[in-house]
Design a protein with these regions (language model features):
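Anion (oxyanion) recognition and catalysis
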Residues: 35, 101, 179
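Asp-based, Mg2+/Mn2+-dependent phosphohydrolase catalytic module
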Residues: 1-9, 105, 114-215
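An amphipathic alpha-helix signature
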Residues: 27, 31, 47, 55-60, ...
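Short beta->alpha linker loops
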Residues: 25, 50-54, 77, 91-95, ...
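Helix-loop "lid/cap" segments that line or gate small-molecule binding pockets
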Residues: 33-34, 54-68, 121, 155
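Metal-dependent phosphoesterase signature
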Residues: 60-98
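Short, acidic loop-to-helix structural element flanking the phosphoryl-transfer center
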Residues: 84-109, 115-119
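Active-site neighborhood of HAD-like aspartate-dependent phosphohydrolases
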Residues: 2-48
Length: 215
């Protein structure tokens, strides 16, 4: 694994699966909701298929399984179900609160999710005050990971060159976006390393290990 030669000037965190344990909750919502359309999708399958990808991609996949287009209200109702479940069950990823309280490097958040979902997740987990004014959504640029546009947008808005940024991600699309942006990438792999993870990516298994990787 490669290590940075100098401490980055900006750390850009992903949200889902990196700071908040929302992907497990969202997978349960997917499984429950699509059952009403006659689609069998276990929470485990939803988690494996939908980790780190856009809502548009997920809906397209469900339409293929369903065999016909889904109604216009599908996304709105699904997001409402997810929102309620997140309010009730969402927890921060282990070490997330501590790392944002202790990190001495400026940091931001960049997620494929819309702002309202990001802010919901951060509010429920107590992380929102730490990211005031530094939250970026793929909906801001209309480009979703693995496209690097979101990370480049965040770096530009905060006045930091891409090569001086470090990205912290849990998903392969997020890792690919960070690499394509020319940034250092650190992958949080709590449950085993993804077999397709590029060799140049530094790996941590707990957020407590992040500071050591930042140099």
């Amino acid at each position: 694994m490669k290590h940075p030669s100098a401490t980055p000037e900006l750390v850009i965190f992903d949200c889902d699966g990196t700071l908040v344990d929302s992907e497990v909750v969202a997978a349960r919502a997917w499984s429950e909701y699509v059952a009403g359309y006659g689609v069998t999708l276990s929470p485990e399958d939803a988690l494996a298929r939908f980790r780190g990808v856009s809502m548009k991609w997920c809906i397209s996949h469900i339409e293929q399984l369903h065999g016909q287009p889904l109604p216009a209200h599908f996304e709105q109702e699904l997001r409402a179900l997810m929102g309620g479940m997140l309010e009730q069950h969402l927890q921060p990823i282990s070490g997330a609160v501590e790392i944002v309280e202790q990190l001495h490097v400026p940091f931001a958040l960049a997620s494929n999710a819309p702002h309202h979902k990001i802010e919901l997740c951060l509010r429920v987990t107590g992380l929102l005050p730490h990211f005031a004014g530094r939250i970026f959504s793929a909906y801001d640029v209309q480009r979703w990971k693995p496209d690097p546009a979101l990370f480049l947008f965040a770096a530009e808005r905060l006045g930091v060159a891409p090569q001086r940024c470090a990205v912290v991600e849990d998903s392969l699309p997020g890792v690919q976006a960070g690499l394509a942006a020319g940034m250092q990438v650190i992958a949080l792999q709590e449950h085993g390393v993804h077999p397709e993870l590029p060799a140049e990516v530094a790996v941590i298994t707990h957020l407590a290990q992040l500071r050591a990787k930042l140099g």
